[in-house]
Amino acid sequence: MLRTSTPNLCGGLHCRAPWLSSGILCLCLIFLLGQVGLLQGHPQCLDYGPPFQPPLHLEFCSDYESFGCCDQHKDRRIAARYWDIMEYFDLKRHELCGDYIKDILCQECSPYAAHLYDAENTQTPLRNLPGLCSDYCSAFHSNCHSAISLLTNDRGLQESHGRDGTRFCHLLDLPDKDYCFPNVLRNDYLNRHLGMVAQDPQGCLQLCLSEVANGLRNPVSMVHAGDGTHRFFVAEQVGVVWVYLPDGSRLEQPFLDLKNIVLTTPWIGDERGFLGLAFHPKFRHNRKFYIYYSCLDKKKVEKIRISEMKVSRADPNKADLKSERVILEIEEPASNHNGGQLLFGLDGYMYIFTGDGGQAGDPFGLFGNAQNKSSLLGKVLRIDVNRAGSHGKRYRVPSDNPFVSEPGAHPAIYAYGIRNMWRCAVDRGDPITRQGRGRIFCGDVGQNRFEEVDLILKGGNYGWRAKEGFACYDKKLCHNASLDDVLPIYAYGHAVGKSVTGGYVYRGCESPNLNGLYIFGDFMSGRLMALQEDRKNKKWKKQDLCLGSTTSCAFPGLISTHSKFIISFAEDEAGELYFLATSYPSAYAPRGSIYKFVDPSRRAPPGKCKYKPVPVRTKSKRIPFRPLAKTVLDLLKEQSEKAARKSSSATLASGPAQGLSEKGSSKKLASPTSSKNTLRGPGTKKKARVGPHVRQGKRRKSLKSHSGRMRPSAEQKRAGRSLP
């Protein structure tokens, strides 16, 4: 869908896509884009990014101040060029041609600028005048043909304008008449939903992705330190944490390596391992972070451990292994439903999310662990890690925890009735109004029928094992009048997916259309979904998220596919949203990738989302990021080359003589080649054993399981979330 400049313009406006973050550049894809045919148009600017809403009033090209491709600086440049041209005209010609010239110059601001300048059709010359509809062009040529030489230095257009208006207008014709000016302004279909997130006929929101990391072994968590460095830390289930820098590179040496302590296995579905990571809100000052992992104690008893650690004073990208201080250990009666989320609330307290202890149906005791307030399993715990407690505890229980005065209840409990919440997040709140700030969202994995999304409330009972989603699971407990459970904000059946992965409310800068959407997914089905709250009735509406077509995602660096198994979601320090997924969910298989969400329909105004990371010294070698996923442009190139080979083969087959030159020599078709790349993850020494816009006239050159897991036993197969 895109086209760059010819080589002499490399490094100019159209060789880069500055709207893409993390240094993703469109590096003069002359050959590639020269192979791509005409595609259906979509809103796109001449820098190949989506249009935007200008932050300030446009004084000159005011038709596009609500939505388009110009900010105030570009608007002023266009106005200056207009007045330079108008100096050549007397008053009569000024009145006759002024509007035409303004209209033509301002098409650079149109949300369809790339189409008006035919910047997408790489098989036709790139224009330096926009495509004009025939009637408008004829009127312009008839009244103002002397202005053409002032608008363009293209020889073909300059030669044609003095002779024949028909020829001139033919040169400015567009293949698709809907996109010529001024028709493009009158087309209801093209303008009805302009600037909104694109939807397919089924109402599925169309987004695109950018690959930012790969070769990871079941990446279960990606977090930032909140210290202004804009690094992100990616934890693998096996127990290794890697540092990624703002330029997209990864440090060769891991931030933390606990492989020798973390309990996990290579078999698919093992939920144990390194499961959670959170940085202290005052990390910049105290260097503290917290981890959640599975382990064996000295007696070989399986436990989950929450520890405090510090970053090395000698290297800000290395943890001090000697600094580990165990905060809490909880014995696990089974090997699944291990929970794993750690986060800090706006109150500064740490929230810990534990699973119900495992097996199917929470069979422990009369009403299970989740409903038992004397057990720490199946709970949301809230503790103060800044102060020590009584009896040698390395944390203090906040005095306003809901059950501190209830006999028999553990005082650290904040909420209960939880099966196995997998991935929770704190809402940053609306960037302007702060609405929603501090809410905690979680995805709770279901048993046999339903997956659910919950809002965590103080003292809330989330129903398990009495209920699963909105439905009864244990009928006796379900009909107990004292249950008084908090219902999910959304639940879905197993026809949609069998293992929910909780996400985030988008509060970033780069994709303003997504603000307020809670984006989450399902591990087993690989589906991406979004919830949006109706502020009037407080109900949540669900919409599916689809990865856009070759039309909507044909931007530099964007892809429209992802690995199936969605393990986790993440938010960077700027608030942009990502998800972590793998094609083979084994803790030892380096098949995991990280993807960033991109809205192709609208971006933030240029410069709004820029930030300057706090410098961080690095001792370890930086490994540049090399994407493995094929971009939409890669796929379009392949399709075009395949069609060209097929056409050439058909031509040769229809008559051998046609394939010979006058000298009788034959032309050979180049055969495509392929290469195999061994996927090697960071720190992996061995491959894991895993299963089956130039001047006118120039051209530009299955895994299946029940309840989200593959399990070694029938009972476990019916129990909890698939990895981790």
UniProtKB/Swiss-Prot annotation:
Biased composition (Basic residues): 683-709
Disordered as annotated region, ranges: 643-724
Name this protein carries in UniProt: HHIP-like protein 2
Family in the record: Belongs to the HHIP family.
Native source organism of the sequence: Homo sapiens
GO cellular component: extracellular region
Bridged cysteine pairs (disulfide): C204-C546, C208-C553, C424-C442, C509-C609
Glycosylation sites: N480
